């Protein structure tokens, strides 16, 4: 079954902190709460390093919820034809699900269906079949814990499995699990889609998670993303799910993620100013 979603506004942890040490976790959670967000999206690239008890205490202290995202690596790529690598990917995804469950979260999103990064060629039938099978296993595992999985559609330089929302929906048809949803990100859509509405309208209630990011990943409204069309489409389908503000700058670096995403430029310095203005921007439109 699919698990309940609500319209809620969150911020990606990397807006405030590049690590999840005790100090980093407090900085991120306090920052998200200070800006007025409902939840924080925690990057579970290495879920074994998360201090669950500490994080739960901080979430309670700041009255914040948590969801989680991650991207796989070459060592954990579930599209691989090497069963040992697929097994490592399964293990990582299960551990991330366990951590999210312990934190009381209900949405696991991101590039959880392949390695996050540029592939040397298109996916083979076997690569795709392996990915579909892995998502079926993950969805079933997550369902036992009341968790939805949201598969993020990203640009051609970060996956060869799905680059548009329509491709994502076709992939979800193969996964065929009620708790598996589409995750759209305006930054990636701006690169790959023919307009910002088509995939949203096609997805309808299968759209389960949204990332709001500008074309350069900085301040919202200062790039070339057509947010008016995107939010109009969300209204047309009456979207009721998480909306996360996501932004990256060399000001705050996570070595496991920033280099993979090619975050070379310093697009902002003040996390609080960035996050506060982003939430205002989003709520004015949705």
Curated annotation (Swiss-Prot):
Enzyme class, spelled out: isomerase
Binding site for D-fructose: 12, 69, 152, 158, 188, 211, 217, 246
The EC number(s) this enzyme carries: 5.1.3.31
GO molecular function: isomerase activity; metal ion binding
Keyword annotations: Carbohydrate metabolism, Isomerase, Manganese, Metal-binding
Thermal activity profile: Optimum temperature is 70 degrees Celsius with D-allulose as substrate.
Catalytic residues (UniProt): 152 (proton donor/acceptor), 246 (proton donor/acceptor)
Pfam family, one: AP_endonuc_2
Residues the record lists as binding D-allulose: 12, 69, 152, 158, 188, 211, 217, 246
Database matches in InterPro entries: IolE/XylAMocC-like, Xyl_isomerase-like_sf, Xyl_isomerase-like_TIM-brl
Cofactor requirement: Mn(2+)
Transmembrane segments: none
Keyword hit for Metal-binding: yes
Top-rank taxon: Bacteria
Catalytic activity entry: L-ribulose = L-xylulose; D-ribulose = D-xylulose; D-allulose = keto-D-fructose; keto-L-tagatose = keto-L-sorbose
Positions bound to Mn(2+): 152, 185, 211, 246
Subunit description: Homodimer.
PANTHER family: HYDROXYPYRUVATE ISOMERASE, INOSOSE DEHYDRATASE
Function (record text): Catalyzes the epimerization of various ketoses at the C(3) position. Exhibits the highest enzymatic activity toward L-ribulose, followed by D-ribulose, D-allulose and D-fructose. Shows lower activity with L-xylulose, L-tagatose, D-xylulose, D-tagatose, L-sorbose, D-sorbose, and weak activity with L-allulose and L-fructose.
Record note on domains: Contains a unique short C-terminal alpha-helix compared to the known structures of the structurally similar homotetrameric L-ribulose 3-epimerases and D-allulose 3-epimerases. The length of the C-terminal alpha-helix was thought to be involved in tetramerization and increasing stability, however, the addition of residues to MetLRE at the C terminus does not lead to tetramer formation.
Similarity comment: family membership: Belongs to the hyi family.
Protein name per UniProt: L-ribulose 3-epimerase
